[in-house]
Amino acid sequence: MCSSDLKVLAADGTIHSLALKWFGTDNTTFDSDAGALDALGDIPQRTFIMGLNEERFPMSYADGDGYSGFDVELAQAVCARLGWTLQYQSIANRNAYVELSSGNVDCAWGGMVLDQTDSKDSKNKKKQKMTLTAPYLENRLLLIVRGDSKYRTGSSLKGTTVLLGTDETYMAALSSEEKLMKNFGTAQRVTGGSKACFEALAAGSCAAIVADSAALAYYTH
């Protein structure tokens, strides 16, 4: 049902507007179908619990007493069209499958990844028990420096401090680059995800950060 609603939101321009707001451009790849909900008939009202990672700015993040981000506003648009009440539940990426299986959340939305330590067979079994949407936005992890920085190569960062979020995907990506890791003086994990990392970089508290390309698009558009 949510997938059908997303097709309608793509057709009426809602997703395009959200993408421009958060990224400055629309690189989303949602299927578009203005009549996707027509065959579903009456849609019963319900409460929809969105499991989100609150450190994946600008997709989903803690904002004061609530949450904000592209995925959060997209979920709001989905529930508004379906007549559902939206609730949020903060979850860790590594626990997404458990949270879904236990019924604590109806959907894991915003930065969810399958456990990279799982075997291929284990991943396939998990996928068979979940309904997955097609990927709708390419989001890469990048090593980022300030525009006025003297650092221009990985080797030039030798002995410096690099910040990254607490989510395991950041450290896993960095650890996979052994040669690069050996150059750093310190790879420091901070709470607050990409948002906190960009704020520290702007303040000159570190030489570089590991952050999402979606966050870079937000800060540079």
Tell me the role of every PLM-derived stretch.
Residues 44-54, 68, 154-172:
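Short loop->beta-strand "edge-of-pocket" segments that line small-molecule binding or catalytic clefts
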Residues 136, 144, 165, 186-191, ...:
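Soluble extramembrane regions of membrane proteins in the secretory/endomembrane system
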Residues 134, 145-162, 181:
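Flexible hinge/capping segments at coil-to-helix
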Residues 95-101, 109-127, 173-178, 202-221:
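A ligand-binding cleft/hinge motif common to bilobed small-molecule-binding domains
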Residues 125-144, 193:
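Short Pro/Gly-enriched coil loops immediately N-terminal to beta-strands
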Residues 1, 12, 17, 22, ...:
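Extracytoplasmic small-molecule ligand-binding "clamshell" domains
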Residues 6-42, 169-192:
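Ligand-binding clefts/hinges and TM-proximal coupling segments of bilobed small-molecule sensing domains
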Residues 23, 53-56, 93-94, 112-114, ...:
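Solvent-exposed coil/turn segments that connect beta secondary-structure elements
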